[in-house]
């Protein structure tokens, strides 16, 4: 309910905007009386493109109806009676919605309203003003846009009044002109009269004719002056319109597209609804002025008067047609981009939208949109207006869609839900370029009829660059191409040119954005993390981040050439880190439990003076996507230990928290946080009772050289089946080292071979899963991994 409380504190223009959101489709009374229920529902969790979510939408709608009925029944008094009637009416409307195809539209409407309500509250909270109207950092520019719209409204109303005055003046002029013609006809009739009467009538007619012709000449000049003044006013209006349209289309819309280009690298861009409202206002004002200009042309044709007006009107008519064309073609945009890494034979979706679709009657004759995939060269030719009709570089299934108008939200859009790239035709590769560096784009095109077919526009828009793959193993390298393009492409570039080199700080910004978006974490890369990455990329030992600011990173360094001494590229290693965090360790990263970006020597330096049992988690240098444990424990042979890295595959078998819980001798998370305080909330609880008579087995992390004496004496069940938080303190005498019985799990550097241990775990599982009475050979466990002290399995 907190959101509605904040919404009620809005003032001024923000309050008016919020009031406009609510209407007959979702009355503000419903929002007020069901605020707590509304804000507790998962509106954003439903995928509007997934028909399988329809049941959830219907369930939400039924819940709303039930809550409304309860609220309506409890209304008393005169005011309560009126409210009861209104709520009851909405109950009836909502009940009808349940039985039709409207639930999707209903959900879309509510999401639209709640999103914009939250936006208004957020904008109000983020800023301040002397008048008490809270606005965000962009408010000044938005205020200027709204002021210009008000100015345009006033000048358009002024030219409308001037046009009406011109029309009235011209109509009266025509009446007087007809009177002049009638007088001339009367002169012809004077020949039939006698001379005396004819002379008398002729003198009166001549006086009247002279007076009328003088008036007509003056009025003709006045009319011409009115026409010129009106044309000049239209010229000034169009100048202001062009300026406003440039701000909205070339600044605001381009900025939205730029933020959209970085999708997957930062938070989603703000809603298009504000932009659409501006574009719709532009469309209304442009169309009003166009109609005025056409009426002025009609008046000139109705009563031709020699002068410059015809040429002026032809010029402003051509200008306003250009303005309309720019508005329509520029506001045909891709709201939901297709995946930038596109795998053949895989379903994908996209959404295109016309931001002025509801204001120019485009929706009265719903247009069809077609999607095709074209190459980089074909995209260049298209932007040069070269003839590329019917050229494509592949075949997309289900590539045609009719645009739909959603009356509640006022949007005209086409949702491609089931497209699939059947085949792709590649160009000849250049030099060392791989298939994952080749870029394509999805072309969306349609034809719009504006204003009852008065104008017809061919519209086209290109998606962000797309890299086509045929196998999942190509995904990582394709993502690198997409990242480099999204981050470093210049606005207005030739498709799809990108710099071959960028400065290290530029790459830092891109990596940080990508990291936060991919891991879905507010904890980004620190200066220490970036320093580690710089040292890794440049193979440099300098410990000052500023030393790298002037260095350039080439595309080859980023993802074409292996890092010195390793068999992977910089991006492949970094992408592996993001993948393992995203899939398995995101909570621990957010908690600050994973130090991550340190090498083995740095870990040694950090731990060397710490108490025994202090450990840290770092990303492996040798394994892509590997995470390893380094810990301090003094022994006759060594005092620092490194566990062999485990990757995404091992993380899916047993969680990091459970693995750490298994190792009782790991006590403190670097620098000095008790392990259980950090990780215990993530431990998997042990089932107290058997299910269906069976006891569920567990896999536990064991390092053979670190097994406590108590565990040895307790037997195998304690070692392999128990799962409990480790003690906060583990006395040193409980450690039992086995130097006389070297174990192949630890290498000479003290690294634990997890692969061999997992072989043992799988062997145990195979034994436990065998049905009773089953016979047949079973592969023996790896030698040397089970000792008598740990018990035996039978």
Curated annotation (Swiss-Prot):
SMART domains, sorted: SH2, STAT_int
Keywords linked to the UniProt accession: Activator, Cytoplasm, DNA-binding, Lactation, Nucleus, Phosphoprotein, SH2 domain, Transcription, Transcription regulation, Ubl conjugation
Cellular component, GO annotation: cytoplasm; cytosol; nucleus
Record bears the keyword Transmembrane helix: no
Any one GO MF annotation of this record: DNA binding
Superkingdom of the source species: Eukaryota
Modification Phosphoserine, positions: 129
Residues carrying Phosphotyrosine: 90, 682, 694
Predominant subcellular localization, coarse grouping: cytoplasm
Pfam families, A to Z: SH2, STAT_alpha, STAT_bind, STAT_int, STAT_linker
Residues covered by the SH2 domain: 589-686
Induction entry: By prolactin.
GO terms classed as biological process: cell surface receptor signaling pathway via JAK-STAT; cytokine-mediated signaling pathway; development of secondary female sexual characteristics; female pregnancy; lactation; lipid storage; luteinization; mammary gland development
Subcellular location, record wording: Cytoplasm; Nucleus
Description of how the protein assembles with itself and partners: Forms a homodimer or a heterodimer with a related family member. Binds NR3C1. Interacts with NCOA1 and SOCS7. Interacts with ERBB4. Interacts with EBF4. Interacts with CD69.
Functional summary from the UniProt entry: Carries out a dual function: signal transduction and activation of transcription. Mediates cellular responses to the cytokine KITLG/SCF and other growth factors. May mediate cellular responses to activated FGFR1, FGFR2, FGFR3 and FGFR4. Binds to the GAS element and activates PRL-induced transcription. Regulates the expression of milk proteins during lactation.
Family, similarity comment: Belongs to the transcription factor STAT family.
UniProt protein name: Signal transducer and activator of transcription 5A
